[in-house]
Amino acid sequence: KMFDTKKEKGEESYGRGENFMYYPKEETVKFLNRFVKKKKSLEEYVQLIDSPEKLRGLDFGCGIGRMTILLHEFDIDGYGIDISQNAVIEGKKLSKHFGFNLESYLQAYDGEKIPFDDNYFDFTISEGVLDSMPFELAKKLIKDIERVTKRYFFLSLISAESADMFRQTKNEELFDGEVEVEEAHEKGTIQSLFSKSKIEEFIKDTDFKIKWCELHTVEGCVNKYQHGRWYLVLEK
Protein backbone atom coordinates (compact mmCIF):
# COMPACT_ATOMS: atom_id res chain seq x y z
CA LYS A 1 0.00 0.00 0.00
CA MET A 2 1.35 3.43 -0.95
CA PHE A 3 0.98 6.12 1.69
CA ASP A 4 0.83 9.86 1.20
CA THR A 5 3.95 10.83 3.14
CA LYS A 6 3.24 14.55 2.51
CA LYS A 7 6.82 14.68 1.24
CA GLU A 8 6.09 17.75 -0.86
CA LYS A 9 4.63 19.61 2.15
CA GLY A 10 7.63 18.53 4.24
CA GLU A 11 10.01 19.88 1.58
CA GLU A 12 8.07 23.16 1.49
CA SER A 13 8.28 23.41 5.29
CA TYR A 14 12.05 22.79 5.19
CA GLY A 15 12.34 25.22 2.28
CA ARG A 16 10.93 27.85 4.64
CA GLY A 17 13.51 26.81 7.28
CA GLU A 18 10.72 25.93 9.74
CA ASN A 19 12.23 22.73 11.07
CA PHE A 20 15.92 23.53 11.02
CA MET A 21 17.12 22.46 14.48
CA TYR A 22 20.58 23.89 15.08
CA TYR A 23 20.82 22.74 18.71
CA PRO A 24 20.50 19.26 20.21
CA LYS A 25 17.25 18.47 22.01
CA GLU A 26 17.81 18.18 25.76
CA GLU A 27 15.74 14.99 26.05
CA THR A 28 17.91 13.24 23.44
CA VAL A 29 21.06 14.19 25.36
CA LYS A 30 19.47 12.77 28.53
CA PHE A 31 18.54 9.53 26.74
CA LEU A 32 22.12 9.02 25.53
CA ASN A 33 23.49 9.67 29.02
CA ARG A 34 21.00 7.38 30.76
CA PHE A 35 20.86 4.45 28.37
CA VAL A 36 23.70 4.52 25.83
CA LYS A 37 26.89 6.29 26.85
CA LYS A 38 27.39 8.50 29.89
CA LYS A 39 29.69 11.47 29.56
CA LYS A 40 32.06 11.36 32.54
CA SER A 41 34.50 14.16 31.72
CA LEU A 42 35.61 16.13 28.67
CA GLU A 43 37.28 13.10 27.11
CA GLU A 44 35.75 10.16 29.00
CA TYR A 45 32.57 8.16 28.52
CA VAL A 46 31.13 5.14 30.27
CA GLN A 47 29.46 2.87 27.70
CA LEU A 48 26.12 1.55 28.97
CA ILE A 49 25.35 -0.78 26.05
CA ASP A 50 27.59 -3.86 25.84
CA SER A 51 29.20 -4.07 22.43
CA PRO A 52 32.64 -5.23 21.28
CA GLU A 53 32.43 -2.74 18.39
CA LYS A 54 31.87 0.99 18.18
CA LEU A 55 28.20 1.75 18.84
CA ARG A 56 25.95 2.57 15.89
CA GLY A 57 22.82 4.69 16.12
CA LEU A 58 20.13 5.71 13.63
CA ASP A 59 18.61 9.20 13.68
CA PHE A 60 15.29 8.44 12.00
CA GLY A 61 13.80 11.53 10.34
CA CYS A 62 17.05 13.39 10.99
CA GLY A 63 16.11 16.73 9.40
CA ILE A 64 19.30 18.78 9.15
CA GLY A 65 21.14 16.18 11.19
CA ARG A 66 21.83 17.99 14.46
CA MET A 67 21.07 14.85 16.49
CA THR A 68 23.17 12.75 14.08
CA ILE A 69 26.04 15.17 14.77
CA LEU A 70 25.33 14.79 18.51
CA LEU A 71 25.85 11.02 18.17
CA HIS A 72 29.26 11.66 16.61
CA GLU A 73 30.05 14.07 19.48
CA PHE A 74 29.44 11.05 21.74
CA ASP A 75 31.85 9.05 19.51
CA ILE A 76 29.00 6.92 18.18
CA ASP A 77 28.66 6.07 14.49
CA GLY A 78 25.47 8.02 13.87
CA TYR A 79 23.53 7.69 10.63
CA GLY A 80 20.65 9.97 9.65
CA ILE A 81 17.86 9.46 7.12
CA ASP A 82 15.09 11.84 6.08
CA ILE A 83 12.56 12.18 3.26
CA SER A 84 13.70 15.77 2.66
CA GLN A 85 16.61 16.19 0.25
CA ASN A 86 16.75 19.91 1.25
CA ALA A 87 17.31 18.97 4.88
CA VAL A 88 19.99 16.36 4.12
CA ILE A 89 21.96 18.84 1.97
CA GLU A 90 21.82 21.38 4.81
CA GLY A 91 22.84 18.65 7.30
CA LYS A 92 25.99 17.79 5.37
CA LYS A 93 26.99 21.48 5.46
CA LEU A 94 26.16 21.73 9.16
CA SER A 95 28.27 18.66 10.01
CA LYS A 96 31.35 20.35 8.51
CA HIS A 97 30.69 23.38 10.73
CA PHE A 98 31.05 21.02 13.73
CA GLY A 99 34.22 19.43 12.35
CA PHE A 100 32.65 16.20 11.07
CA ASN A 101 32.28 14.98 7.53
CA LEU A 102 28.94 13.17 7.44
CA GLU A 103 28.69 12.87 3.64
CA SER A 104 28.31 9.10 3.89
CA TYR A 105 26.24 9.18 7.11
CA LEU A 106 23.30 11.35 6.03
CA GLN A 107 20.95 10.34 3.24
CA ALA A 108 17.49 11.03 1.80
CA TYR A 109 15.24 7.97 1.52
CA ASP A 110 11.79 7.15 0.11
CA GLY A 111 9.85 7.42 3.40
CA GLU A 112 8.78 3.75 3.25
CA LYS A 113 11.77 1.37 3.62
CA ILE A 114 14.80 2.03 5.84
CA PRO A 115 17.90 1.34 3.69
CA PHE A 116 19.86 -0.68 6.28
CA ASP A 117 20.28 -4.35 7.22
CA ASP A 118 18.50 -6.11 10.09
CA ASN A 119 19.88 -5.22 13.56
CA TYR A 120 22.39 -2.82 12.01
CA PHE A 121 21.95 -0.28 14.84
CA ASP A 122 22.37 -0.65 18.59
CA PHE A 123 19.66 1.99 19.03
CA THR A 124 17.47 4.42 17.10
CA ILE A 125 16.34 7.94 18.01
CA SER A 126 13.43 9.83 16.49
CA GLU A 127 12.32 13.26 17.71
CA GLY A 128 8.85 14.35 16.62
CA VAL A 129 8.78 12.34 13.37
CA LEU A 130 6.33 9.45 13.68
CA ASP A 131 3.63 11.91 14.79
CA SER A 132 4.04 13.94 11.56
CA MET A 133 2.42 11.34 9.32
CA PRO A 134 -0.73 9.19 9.13
CA PHE A 135 -0.91 6.68 12.00
CA GLU A 136 -1.11 3.72 9.60
CA LEU A 137 2.19 4.75 7.97
CA ALA A 138 3.80 5.25 11.41
CA LYS A 139 2.73 1.68 12.34
CA LYS A 140 4.41 0.37 9.19
CA LEU A 141 7.60 2.37 9.84
CA ILE A 142 7.96 1.33 13.50
CA LYS A 143 8.07 -2.28 12.25
CA ASP A 144 10.97 -1.33 9.99
CA ILE A 145 12.66 0.57 12.85
CA GLU A 146 12.30 -2.60 14.94
CA ARG A 147 13.92 -4.59 12.11
CA VAL A 148 17.08 -2.43 12.00
CA THR A 149 17.36 -1.84 15.79
CA LYS A 150 19.03 -4.23 18.23
CA ARG A 151 17.95 -2.73 21.53
CA TYR A 152 16.59 0.75 22.27
CA PHE A 153 14.27 3.08 20.42
CA PHE A 154 13.97 6.61 21.85
CA LEU A 155 11.14 8.67 20.42
CA SER A 156 9.02 11.70 21.13
CA LEU A 157 5.39 12.12 20.06
CA ILE A 158 2.90 14.98 20.33
CA SER A 159 0.30 14.18 23.00
CA ALA A 160 -3.50 14.33 23.01
CA GLU A 161 -3.24 17.34 25.36
CA SER A 162 -2.05 19.38 22.34
CA ALA A 163 -5.56 19.58 20.83
CA ASP A 164 -5.44 23.26 21.81
CA MET A 165 -2.75 23.98 19.21
CA PHE A 166 -4.89 23.29 16.13
CA ARG A 167 -7.94 25.20 14.93
CA GLN A 168 -9.93 22.04 14.13
CA THR A 169 -9.57 20.57 17.65
CA LYS A 170 -9.34 23.73 19.76
CA ASN A 171 -12.51 23.00 21.74
CA GLU A 172 -11.52 19.46 22.64
CA GLU A 173 -9.64 18.85 25.86
CA LEU A 174 -8.02 15.67 24.54
CA PHE A 175 -7.76 14.50 20.93
CA ASP A 176 -5.80 11.50 19.69
CA GLY A 177 -6.70 11.47 16.00
CA GLU A 178 -5.04 13.19 13.04
CA VAL A 179 -5.23 16.77 11.78
CA GLU A 180 -3.97 18.37 8.59
CA VAL A 181 -2.21 21.51 9.79
CA GLU A 182 -3.89 24.73 8.63
CA GLU A 183 -1.64 27.06 10.61
CA ALA A 184 1.23 28.76 8.73
CA HIS A 185 3.91 26.73 10.56
CA GLU A 186 4.13 23.29 8.88
CA LYS A 187 1.01 24.08 6.79
CA GLY A 188 -0.41 21.06 4.95
CA THR A 189 1.52 18.49 7.00
CA ILE A 190 -0.18 15.82 9.12
CA GLN A 191 -0.07 15.83 12.92
CA SER A 192 -1.09 12.61 14.65
CA LEU A 193 -1.77 13.14 18.36
CA PHE A 194 -1.12 10.32 20.84
CA SER A 195 -2.84 9.14 24.02
CA LYS A 196 -1.44 6.31 26.17
CA SER A 197 -3.84 3.83 24.56
CA LYS A 198 -2.81 4.95 21.06
CA ILE A 199 0.86 4.39 22.01
CA GLU A 200 -0.06 0.85 23.11
CA GLU A 201 -1.86 0.28 19.80
CA PHE A 202 1.18 1.74 18.00
CA ILE A 203 3.67 -0.78 19.43
CA LYS A 204 1.46 -3.86 19.84
CA ASP A 205 2.62 -5.58 16.63
CA THR A 206 6.31 -5.14 17.52
CA ASP A 207 8.64 -6.76 20.07
CA PHE A 208 9.21 -3.36 21.65
CA LYS A 209 8.20 -2.90 25.29
CA ILE A 210 8.03 0.45 27.08
CA LYS A 211 11.12 0.70 29.31
CA TRP A 212 10.74 4.37 30.26
CA CYS A 213 8.06 6.97 29.55
CA GLU A 214 7.33 10.59 30.51
CA LEU A 215 4.56 12.95 29.46
CA HIS A 216 5.69 16.60 29.48
CA THR A 217 2.85 19.14 29.44
CA VAL A 218 3.26 22.89 29.09
CA GLU A 219 0.72 25.59 29.90
CA GLY A 220 0.84 29.13 28.57
CA CYS A 221 0.57 31.85 31.23
CA VAL A 222 0.03 34.91 29.00
CA ASN A 223 -1.90 33.37 26.11
CA LYS A 224 -3.83 30.45 27.55
CA TYR A 225 -2.88 27.23 25.79
CA GLN A 226 -1.70 23.75 26.62
CA HIS A 227 0.42 21.27 24.74
CA GLY A 228 2.28 18.11 25.59
CA ARG A 229 4.83 15.59 24.34
CA TRP A 230 5.51 11.98 25.19
CA TYR A 231 9.13 10.86 25.58
CA LEU A 232 9.59 7.10 25.42
CA VAL A 233 12.36 4.55 25.52
CA LEU A 234 11.27 1.28 23.94
CA GLU A 235 13.37 -1.86 24.35
CA LYS A 236 13.54 -5.10 22.38
Identify the residue ranges that each predicted region occupies.
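Short amphipathic alpha-helix with an adjacent loop that forms part of the alpha/beta core around
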Residues: I114-N119
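A conserved beta-strand element that flanks and buttresses the S-adenosyl-L-methionine
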Residues: I125
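A short glycine-rich, Lys/Arg-flanked "PGG" loop and its adjoining helix->strand segment in the class I
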Residues: K139-R151
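Short, well-ordered alpha-helix to beta-strand connector turns
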Residues: D75, F121, T149-K150
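Short catalytic micro-motifs in class I SAM-dependent methyltransferases
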Residues: G128-S132
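Hydrophobic pocket-lining residues that define ligand/cofactor binding sites across diverse proteins
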Residues: S95, M133, T149
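Class I (Rossmann-like) S-adenosyl-L-methionine-dependent methyltransferase catalytic domain
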Residues: K1-G57, G63-K113, L137, F153-K236
